[in-house]
Amino acid sequence: MKKTPLKIGFDLDGVLLYNPARIFRPVTIVAKSILRQKKQTKTEFYYPKTEFEKILWNIVHWSSLYIADGYDEIIKLSDNKNIQSYIITSRYDCLKKDFERWLEKMHADTVFTAAFHNKNNLQPHVFKAQKIKELGLDFFVEDNWDIVQHINNNTHAKGLWISNAFDKSIPYNEKFMSLKEAMAFIKQTIDRD
């Protein structure tokens, strides 16, 4: 009997694309807490409003340097119909052109069932949770710990976390240091079922 393919979503920056800047997450958390006038009571992410901020936001995303090691395993599992894969990036609409450039570079149309960017500029965790529910995903591979927690608490999908050197001490079972490690876990899950 043919197995139903696992439905898996992938974040773009820091997951499908290697992004060394993600190691600065702890630094940005400390800076935000110092600069913030009031205590943060919920998950919220910065949104660039002015044209200048949007230009800076584009420059910041240039830190996604190349396709991450492990991408070839997504291609194999997709080609073999073991997974239905989706790109769900919280990149705001001001980054649409760069998103499309990466889709072309990755030949995403031949690998992924669909690719979505945050064209309505929702808060990233809200956008991703909505798409995950809409698509009925089994897993979502994400490098932001706050978003992983939000996914686990607000969807039926299991968040697979690509951690970093500073956050690796946070206890979590489905924690990996690279896309390649996360894909090995997914392959084991498929082979086990």
Predicted regions located by residue number:
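Helix N-cap/beta->alpha junction signal
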Residues: 91-92, 144
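Active-site neighborhood of HAD-like aspartate-dependent phosphohydrolases
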Residues: 1-58
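Short acidic-hydrophobic, aromatic-tinged amphipathic segments that line or gate anion-handling sites
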Residues: 117-118, 173-185
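Short, acidic loop-to-helix structural element flanking the phosphoryl-transfer center
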Residues: 59-87, 93-101
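Acidic, Mg2+-coordinating phosphoryl-transfer loop and its flanking beta/alpha structural elements
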Residues: 137-177
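Generic beta-sheet signal
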Residues: 19, 88, 162-164
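Substrate-recognition "cap/lid" segment bordering the active-site pocket of phosphatases
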Residues: 93-139
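Short catalytic/ligand-binding loop motif for oxyanion handling, primarily in non-cytosolic enzymes
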Residues: 17-20, 25, 94-98, 148-150, ...
